[in-house]
Amino acid sequence: MLSYDYENALKVGEISLEDINKVDFANAYSNLMEKLDNGVVGFRDVIYDENLDKYKSLNGYENVVVIGMGGSILGTMAIYYAISPFNNNAYFIDNSDPEKTLSILKKVDLNESIIYIISKSGNTLETLVNYYLIKKRIEKLNSFKGKLVFITNGGKLKREAEKNNYDIFSIPENVPGRFSVFTAVGLAPLYSLGVDISKILEGAREMDKICQNEDILKNPALLNGVIHYLYDKRGKDISVIMSYVESLKYFGDWYKQLIGESLGKNKHGITPLLSIGAKDQHSLLQLYMDGKKDKIITFMVAKKYRLDEEIEFEDINDEKISCRYSDIIRSQQKATEIALTNNGVPNVRITLDEINEMAMGALLYMYEMQVGFMGELYNINAYNQPAVEEEKKICWRLIKQ
Ligand code: PA5
């Protein structure tokens, strides 16, 4: 599924195995396990929910429209774009930008669509307004042959769904939005999009077994968490995901939310950034290598690309070279890794065997566990988002003025 390499995080010489062992990670580990065992937080329990039959009626629509914000949509996008980067019957309305939303609504035939309205609170402004845009269009149709599905626990949207007898799925209360991709929030729309959700859960469960390991060197979530924690303490508080698989771009967006919203509290926090290799070697690499030394890089690579071929070309000295096309991007990644390490920039590497459902389930779950461990290391509540809630309240006030 995936492997994790951390040798370059030690090679640059700023932290050692001894430093790692000095961190009280055993306490972080047992605190998180206690929270998961006692149901204080439920993101582990949901990967063991085997009842996927409940999604069976959600198949067979030409288009899948998903409306939601933040944790209610980013995980779905991360998995969908990784698994099916070249399909285009998916429409994600994840903002209130009129040009984006209205151009999607112009294009999509609602009669041929299953439309998901996803909001745990049921009161998020953007989601509510985007639903009303859809509602207005549906009301104008003579008869609506598509399907509306609500994934919500309450608020205005749940009342709307109940009033109109729409399908409703709920989200376990102890699973916060950004940890909810393995609930109906992610699984229902992914199922409609043809993604094998049982394999996603299988990948997450395999990773869960690995993350139960108390030996930090055998537990990538714990180890990556401690490495990022130690570098943060040394002033390297910007965590860059540099993916050499472009279809992981939306995984990067999900990562930014998970890290930013979970750990950015009480003056703590790591700033997550996303870069795409090899493109960003021609832009941001200058900053990463030669600029302020405040970053730790996570390379994301694939052992096997789903499309590949033999190529032949001539180099600048007219010498013939033949190789696989994927050897080019692999060499670029390796070269960047060596150069960064030589310049004292710590980096780790996650290698996915192939981009598929199992690997994506494992990857997202690994990060959920990592952030859970990191919340314990910083002694903060990784599962709330008071600052986000504060803005939501102010915005409701402004809109009503
Ligand atoms: O992680 C979170 O809790 C947030 O990002 C929410 O997912 C986001 O604000 C949307 O909230 P809701 O699902 O209530 O519409």
UniProtKB/Swiss-Prot annotation:
Q: Which organism is it from?
A: Methanocaldococcus jannaschii (strain ATCC 43067 / DSM 2661 / JAL-1 / JCM 10045 / NBRC 100440) (Methanococcus jannaschii)
Query: Per its UniProt record, what InterPro entries does this chain match?
Result: G6P_Isomerase (IPR001672), GPI (IPR053509), Phosphoglucose_isomerase_CS (IPR018189), SIS_dom_sf (IPR046348), SIS_PGI_1 (IPR035476), SIS_PGI_2 (IPR035482)
Q: Name one Pfam family in it.
A: PGI
Subunit annotation: Homodimer.
Reactions catalysed, semicolon-separated, are: alpha-D-glucose 6-phosphate = beta-D-fructose 6-phosphate
Pathway named in the protein's UniProt entry: Carbohydrate biosynthesis; gluconeogenesis; Carbohydrate degradation; glycolysis; D-glyceraldehyde 3-phosphate and glycerone phosphate from D-glucose: step 2/4
Its activity depends on temperature as follows: Optimum temperature is 89 degrees Celsius. It does not lose activity upon incubation at 80 degrees Celsius for about 120 minutes and still has a half-life at 95 degrees Celsius of 40 minutes. At 100 degrees Celsius, an almost complete loss of activity is observed after 30 min.
Q: What is its main location?
A: cytoplasm
> What is this protein's function?
Catalyzes the isomerization of glucose-6-P to fructose-6-P.
- Catalytic residues identified in the record: E261 (proton donor), H282, K392
Q: What is this protein called?
A: Glucose-6-phosphate isomerase
- List the PROSITE patterns hit by this protein, alphabetically: P_GLUCOSE_ISOMERASE_1, P_GLUCOSE_ISOMERASE_2, P_GLUCOSE_ISOMERASE_3
Alphabetically sorted, this entry's keywords are: Cytoplasm, Gluconeogenesis, Glycolysis, Isomerase
Q: What is its EC number?
A: 5.3.1.9
> What does the entry say about activity and pH?
Optimum pH is 6.3. 50% remaining activity is observed at pH 5.3 and pH 7.
Q: Which CDD domains match?
A: SIS_PGI_1, SIS_PGI_2
- Is Phosphoprotein there in the keyword field? no
Is Transmembrane a UniProt keyword of this protein? no
Q: Which EC class does it fall in?
A: isomerase
The major lineage groups are: Archaea, Methanobacteriati, Methanobacteriota, Methanomada group, Methanococci
Q: Which GO terms describe its biological process?
A: gluconeogenesis; glucose 6-phosphate metabolic process; glycolytic process
